[in-house]
């Protein structure tokens, strides 16, 4: 399955959920926000949000500082 993540085309095995994608990419769920096809998806919806061929995702990492 081809997905576009932050403007880059990537191939993944399907089926895949948003939670599975975050895990696969080695990201910490509490430190990212995800936009799927131009809509923000709440973190509690990630486990039941299935991804499909051609989906476009923007993943934003939160960085602390001060």
Residue ranges of model-derived segments:
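Ubiquitin-like/PB1-type beta-grasp interaction modules and other compact soluble beta-rich domains
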Residues: 1-65
């Amino acid at each position: 399955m081809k997905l576009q993540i932050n403007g880059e085309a990537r191939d993944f095995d399907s089926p895949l959920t948003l939670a599975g994608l975050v895990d696969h990419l080695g990201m910490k769920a509490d430190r990212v926000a995800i936009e799927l096809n131009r809509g923000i998806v709440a973190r509690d919806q990630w486990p039941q949000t299935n991804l499909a061929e051609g989906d476009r995702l923007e993943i934003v990492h939160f960085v602390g500082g001060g």
